[in-house]
Regions:
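C-terminal motif of bacterial Sec signal peptides marking the signal peptidase cleavage site
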Residues: 16-19
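N-terminal non-cleavable signal-anchor helices
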Residues: 13-14, 45
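Surface-exposed, polar helix/loop patches in the mature regions of secreted/periplasmic/lumenal proteins
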Residues: 83-109
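Alpha-helical segments in soluble extracytoplasmic regions
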Residues: 46-87
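Bacterial signal peptide processing site
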Residues: 21-23
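Bacterial N-terminal signal peptides that target proteins for export
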Residues: 1-11
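Generic structural concept
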Residues: 30-33, 37, 58-65, 89-92, ...
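Post-signal peptide N-terminal segment of mature Sec-exported envelope proteins
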Residues: 25-50, 57
Length: 109
């Protein structure tokens, strides 16, 4: 009886501890986050040129952010990262506002 009680207690503790964890480290997410940052900074660097020359790269950045939102939603225990990507996807984010301003004005100095 003691063995059964000990076993059930151990299983309960293991279950509780495993349910409190966070998402595992994901090399793909890390790499894509760094690449997205580099792409955004590259666009900032060339924003003194006509937007139309870099429209494809700007759209690729938006598509990458959209893809990362979908990718992160597919992982469990990942709410904070999902919120981060969703913010970057929203019109309130500085990157979206930057791209809109650049497109509207043509060039930024």
């Amino acid at each position: 009886m003691k063995t059964l009680k000990l076993l059930s207690s151990s299983l309960l503790i293991c279950f509780l501890l495993s349910s409190c964890g966070t998402s595992f480290y994901d090399q793909y997410s890390f790499t894509e986050t760094l690449e997205t940052k580099a792409n955004a900074l590259s666009l900032v660097e060339v924003s003194d040129q006509e937007y139309q020359q870099h429209k494809v790269a700007a759209q690729a950045l938006i598509n990458k952010i959209d893809m990362m939102v979908s990718y992160e939603k597919a992982k469990s225990k990942n709410e904070i990262t999902i919120q981060m990507w969703q913010y970057l996807q929203s019109d309130a984010s500085s990157i979206q506002q930057f791209l809109d301003l650049w497109e509207t004005q043509g060039t930024l100095s």
